[in-house]
């Protein structure tokens, strides 16, 4: 049974500006495992990656019904399977978490569906 649905969209230009102004923002968004993946990417892909992960975590907070204030961004971890598919590996939700991320040149969007067992 679906317990929640959340969607978020991020402007990548804005994400790049935030990174340039305050690099500590990266560690407020990413878990250590996510940061490891981030550090292996080129600058353009880093912005897309961070934007996508930020959108995932915002979408999760909407689906979970709390907003980011009650759930820290690092409470949710989105890694990838061998084929590159994103997968939520850590969250406060006890059921199944489905995630989809997409990018264009200017935007990143993510959708989260929470499913009770």
Where are the regions a protein language model picked out?
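Core catalytic alpha/beta fold that binds nucleotide/phospho-ligands
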Residues: 1-117
């Amino acid at each position: 049974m679906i317990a929640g649905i959340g969607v978020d969209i991020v402007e990548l230009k804005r994400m790049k500006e935030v990174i340039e102004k305050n690099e500590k923002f990266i560690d407020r968004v990413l878990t250590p495992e996510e940061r490891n993946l981030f550090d292996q990417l080129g600058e353009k892909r880093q912005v897309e990656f961070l934007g996508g992960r930020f959108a995932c975590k915002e979408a999760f907070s909407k689906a979970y019904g709390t907003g980011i204030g009650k759930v820290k961004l690092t409470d949710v971890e989105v890694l990838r399977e061998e084929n590159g598919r994103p997968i939520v590996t850590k969250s406060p939700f006890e059921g199944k978490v489905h995630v989809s991320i997409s990018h264009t040149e200017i935007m990143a969007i993510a959708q989260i569906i929470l499913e009770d067992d």
